[in-house]
Amino acid sequence: KGFVPDESNKLWVSDITYIDTLDGCCYLHLVTDAYSRKIVGWCLSETLHAAHTVKALKMAIDATGKGTLEGLIHHSDRGVQYCCDEYVNLLTDYHIKISMTENYNPTDNAIAERVNGTLKTEVIYREQRFTGFDDAERRIASFIDFYNDKRPHSSIGMKVPSQAHQESGEQRKCW
């Protein structure tokens, strides 16, 4: 609590959000860098199985190109996907510190919840409902590219996450 990263890959926040389609529900597993607000790992799935959460984490780890991530903190809620052996072992294998919310309180994982809200507001609620899983995956992938590379954020000085991800030092907030 209260930790403010001064560069990327110091604090990752993770969450899972429900995505409604005309065919039913699917689940978006996200890993976001708290410093840059860049979505560094994600997986859309038709189940809540931990394997999908692990896949999003592996994407984030692979994107760093590093064999160890000592000094990185991974923060999440206490969902079973984040507490399972496979997920915890992957974190510890890369020397990533584990942080979890104390109780179920969305404000304890506010950055992750904000990313969920932005995605839902700008893609899901604003546009036509997803027809099914494939449509959702295609449009979410497109939005994540837009979010990371073209959408300025007031919490990082009106820069885009991919730019902020390359920087260090305090991020100027514009709110």
What are these regions (language model features)?
Residues 1-30, 55-59, 63-64, 69-70:
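Mobile-element integrase/transposase regions
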Residues 1-8, 105, 160-171:
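Basic, flexible linker segments flanking DNA-binding modules
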Residues 33-34, 44-49:
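A short acidic/small-residue loop/turn micro-motif
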Residues 36-39:
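Hydrophobic "anchor" residues
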Residues 48-56:
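A short, well-structured alpha-helical segment
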Residues 76-78, 84-88, 98-120, 132-138, ...:
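RNase H-like two-metal-ion nuclease catalytic core shared by retroviral integrases
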Residues 92-96, 118-175:
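C-terminal domain-tail junction helix/linker
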